[in-house]
């Protein structure tokens, strides 16, 4: 049984994830024998999921095996009681916790490469699983031989080796291992694919499961192209303000993308800049219909912390302002520099004293101001519409009133002509 050893070098510290199953024990055996000169140091990691009674026996066996072969071994016992008590599927949670521990240990050990015993049959099973559960469009179809994770590399040296070859190798060298009885239970989807569906396909002489590997190659090439296109789009069209937790993209440019690329763009933005959202394709498609509608302004709640705001020609992803405190009313008795919400107000000393005290507040229904250079008044709300001001900006913008409660300034959009040079309003942080 030949390993693909291109994923590590002779001066590397390699770490092997060993479950005591036939695959990982055969991998470990090869590393201790035919490939013993291919690395500098070898360490084993074992996870006791604490679900099966045989787990304790497996851990003891591996301790004795590693001691006999002078291998450093680290064991982690997971607590999955929360999922068991709630009747949740433990497979996904176990995988997440397992790799969190791998992350921790690879850092502690200062190791270079983590080896796993995924083989060819695992690859075919994973491809089929992702196709039929609808997760093929936004992920690679199966495993990569080499992948990067949190400062280290994961390598799968058995990915071209079939389960049949592994079994023949085990029988030839009498390699000890444990059989996980739960692998025979077809109530688990992956087991059903492995034990029932794939063998049924292989029985048909006109069908070959191995053709899935060609599909994976083609699919993954298209996936990489989409990822590249998404990064190019983000670089060209997305403006990101990390301090304000705010990003902005042209609504038209986004709407012009094909739906497949829209999904990848949003996946990149939501996972890279914020929390790891898990948005379904169906939800995305509903959003895309709203984005392309003629409605000028609306919002979509992502979570209790994040929101998508559509404002005229802009698509904005931002943190909700629920936790922030904003001024609603402020009184100014004398000239000076003041902050109102996210605006800076400079009140000059030349402003006539008869206008004081000034009232600074946010908008109210029915607000109007006198037009400059002609008769008549205009509604503040109409000014906002004409200037395409987003709803959340309208809610914070300062409106300045004189002593007689006449509006003399509306943010950075309007100042009464007679006092324009004496009241300067700008967004806080603008030069």
From Swiss-Prot:
At the top level, the lineage of the source is Bacteria
Residues binding ATP: 19-24
Gene it is expressed from: tilS
Localized where?
Answer: Cytoplasm
Gene Ontology cellular component annotations, sorted alphabetically: cytoplasm
Q: Does the keyword Ligase apply?
A: yes
Q: Which organism is it from?
A: Staphylococcus aureus (strain MRSA252)
Please, one GO biological process term? Answer: tRNA modification
Question: What keywords sit in the KW lines?
Answer: ATP-binding, Cytoplasm, Ligase, Nucleotide-binding, tRNA processing
- Please report a single Pfam family linked to this protein: TilS_C
Specify the protein name.
tRNA(Ile)-lysidine synthase
Disulfide bonds listed in the record: none
What reactions does this protein catalyze?
cytidine(34) in tRNA(Ile2) + L-lysine + ATP = lysidine(34) in tRNA(Ile2) + AMP + diphosphate + H(+)
Q: What does this protein do?
A: Ligates lysine onto the cytidine present at position 34 of the AUA codon-specific tRNA(Ile) that contains the anticodon CAU, in an ATP-dependent manner. Cytidine is converted to lysidine, thus changing the amino acid specificity of the tRNA from methionine to isoleucine.
Q: Tell me which family the UniProt entry assigns to this protein.
A: Belongs to the tRNA(Ile)-lysidine synthase family.
């Amino acid at each position: 049984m030949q390993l693909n050893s291109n994923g590590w070098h002779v001066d590397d510290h390699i770490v092997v994830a060993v479950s005591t199953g036939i695959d990982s024990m055969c991998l470990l055996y090869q590393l201790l024998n035919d490939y013993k000169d291919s690395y500098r140091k070898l360490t084993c990691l074992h996870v006791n999921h604490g679900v099966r009674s045989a787990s304790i026996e497996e851990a003891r066996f591996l301790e004795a095996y590693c001691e006999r072969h002078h291998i450093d071994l680290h064991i982690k016992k997971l607590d999955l009681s929360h999922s068991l008590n709630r009747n949740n599927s433990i497979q996904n949670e176990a995988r997440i916790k397992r790799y969190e521990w791998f992350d921790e240990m690879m850092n502690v050990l200062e190791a270079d490469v983590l080896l796993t015993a995924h083989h060819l049959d695992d690859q075919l099973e994973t491809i089929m699983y992702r196709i039929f559960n609808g997760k093929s469009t936004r992920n690679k179809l199966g495993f990569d031989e080499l992948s990067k994770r949190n400062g280290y590399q994961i390598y799968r040296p058995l990915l071209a080796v079939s389960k049949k070859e592994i079994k023949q190798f085990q029988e030839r060298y009498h390699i000890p291992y444990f059989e996980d009885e739960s692998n025979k239970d077809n109530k688990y989807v992956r087991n059903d694919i492995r034990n029932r569906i794939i063998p049924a396909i292989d029985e048909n002489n006109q069908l070959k499961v191995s053709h899935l590997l060609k599909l994976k190659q083609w699919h993954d090439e298209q996936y990489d192209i989409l990822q590249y296109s998404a990064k190019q789009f983000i670089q060209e069209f997305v403006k990101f303000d990390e301090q304000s937790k705010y990003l902005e993209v042209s609504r038209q440019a986004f709407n012009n993308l094909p739906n497949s690329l829209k999904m990848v763009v949003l996946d990149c933005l939501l996972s890279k800049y914020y929390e790891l959202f898990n948005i379904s394709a169906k939800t995305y498609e509903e959003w895309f219909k709203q984005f392309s509608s003629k409605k000028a302004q609306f919002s979509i709640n992502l979570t209790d912390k994040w929101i998508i705001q559509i404002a005229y020609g802009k698509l904005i992803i931002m943190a909700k302002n629920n936790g922030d405190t904003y001024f609603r009313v402020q009184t100014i008795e004398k000239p000076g520099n003041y902050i109102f919400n996210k605006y800076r107000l400079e009140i000059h000393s030349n402003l006539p004293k008869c206008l004081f005290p000034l009232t600074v507040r946010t908008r109210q229904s029915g607000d109007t101001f006198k037009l400059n250079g002609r008769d008549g008044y205009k509604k503040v709300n109409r000014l906002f519409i004409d200037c395409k001001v987003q709803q959340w900006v309208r809610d914070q913008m300062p409106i300045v009133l004189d002593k007689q409660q006449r509006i003399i300034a509306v943010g950075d959009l309007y100042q009464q002509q007679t006092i324009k040079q004496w009241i300067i309003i700008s967004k806080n942080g603008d030069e």
